[in-house]
Amino acid sequence: MFLLLLLIPLIGIGFVTIEGNYGLSLINNIRIKSIALTTSIINLVVSLIMFILFDFSSKQFQFIEEHYQISYFDIYLGVDGLSIYFILLTTIIMPIAILCNWNSIQSKNVLSFVVIMLLLETLLLAVFLVLDVLLFYIFFESILPPLFLLIGLFGSSNKVRASFYLFLYTLLGSLFMLLSIVAMSSIMGTTDFDALSKSNFNYVTQLFLFYGIFIAFAVKTPVSFLNTWLLKAHVESPLSGSIILAGIVLKLSLYGIFRLILPLLPKASLNYTYIIYVIGVITIIYASFSTLRTIDIKELIAYSSVSHAAVYSIGAFSNTIQGIEGSIALGLAHGFVSSGLFICAGGILYDRSSTRLITYYRGMAQVMPIFSVLFFILSLGNSGTPLTLNFIGEFMSLYGVFERMPLLGVLASTSIVFSAAYTIFMYNRIVFGGSYSIYFVENIGDVTRREFIMLLVFVVLTVLFGIYPAPILDGLHYSVSSLIYSIN
């Protein structure tokens, strides 16, 4: 059944390619974008149907499909109570990522843009669907070429430099994971998730495998001092690229922790938790101080993403139900809120004023009241305010860390103070901050219907699951309990 999720975007690529052969007139471009948007919405509907049919009382993989491809190599697809939420996150964000650049892509580049977007959706979903370590690595790395092209073709002035930073940093970091996977395969004779989870690597072997995989995920998260590629990619990327990076790509390492590190290398992950916590706390403090000093809106949101990613990453290593469930909830919440904030910064403010400097804006509440309300709710989420999903995820993640190592838990909790400080500064300076300029009255209008729909989706999801998180937390319970049992 989950094969549909991979085939639908590929079928959409076929349709838009056929439509592109008729020329790139204005009407054809609208049709091409409409086909791509419809395709991604159909994929969202399919994922929702599968979510409804999913049995959350089972800890096993479901809807398993086997497809024989080449000699002695089978491709297994399946989903469990952890991956289903990442699949939903992907299918929710992708239609909005296509919609957010609806008017900004030049006519001659429309076909290339939608093909890259649909291909990215297929590859991202494949990461969450495959049940094989080697295939996980292949699809984990295969998203780099489309992202490279997305930033390199449609980014801003320094797009080529940013795309090369993205490609080289993540590719070199992932080579260590490849070495670990090859070692696993040579020792066990298989790369199947289920078979490897039943293996019992000795401690020294686990240690070397752990470091190889962790380095790859540390670059992808990214941790402090390895985040240069992310900042450049966010700042230079088109809006859709920023949304995909913050909303989905940064969650690949979180998912990889639950698939590769915790169940396959339990001794190493338990014994070296303190190192991960120290790195996480340093990342939180470093990213937070960097956020407090920047005046670039996209850069502020990017640094904020690094800080929140560090929180849900250390929560994942807490070895507690609360910490692991909280890390996934915070990962989902961050996907919604950061995507919404990037739309506010790069899709609304920048499109109208052509600047990302916070000091340029003031008094937006007077000329953009609807935008100000939606921006306010997303800012509350980013600062971890109660009644938002971010609060639940952050509180549970930090609770898990505190249960494991109280001192580092206290230091990690400074993220709450820092996130409130820089988010309040950003919102207050843009929305209030004195009288508005006459330029805003003449050139800036409130959100359009398209922009309102995009922001409303993220606002509703953030608040709805913040008030009623049971569909997420209850659904995760069996899978998380099973994961902790396998670790211990």
UniProtKB/Swiss-Prot annotation:
Alphabetized UniProt keyword annotations: Electron transport, Membrane, Mitochondrion, NAD, Respiratory chain, Translocase, Transmembrane, Transmembrane helix, Transport, Ubiquinone
Catalytic class of the enzyme: translocase
GO biological process, one term: ATP synthesis coupled electron transport
This protein's record includes keyword Transcription: no
Subcellular location, record wording: Mitochondrion membrane
Family annotation (InterPro entries): NADH_Q_OxRdtase_chainM/4 (IPR010227), NADH_UbQ_OxRdtase (IPR003918), ND/Mrp_TM (IPR001750)
Top-level taxon of the source organism: Eukaryota
Keyword Glycosyltransferase part of the UniProt annotation: no
Annotated catalysed reactions: a ubiquinone + NADH + 5 H(+)(in) = a ubiquinol + NAD(+) + 4 H(+)(out)
Topological type in the membrane: Multi-pass membrane protein
GO molecular function, one term: ubiquinone binding
Listed transmembrane segments: 1-21, 34-54, 79-99, 110-130, 134-154, 164-184, 207-227, 238-258, 272-292, 301-321, 328-348, 367-387, 407-427, 452-472
EC number annotated for this UniProt entry: 7.1.1.2
Its job: Core subunit of the mitochondrial membrane respiratory chain NADH dehydrogenase (Complex I) that is believed to belong to the minimal assembly required for catalysis. Complex I functions in the transfer of electrons from NADH to the respiratory chain. The immediate electron acceptor for the enzyme is believed to be ubiquinone.
Listed NCBIfam families: NDH_I_M (TIGR01972)
Name used for this protein in its record: NADH-ubiquinone oxidoreductase chain 4
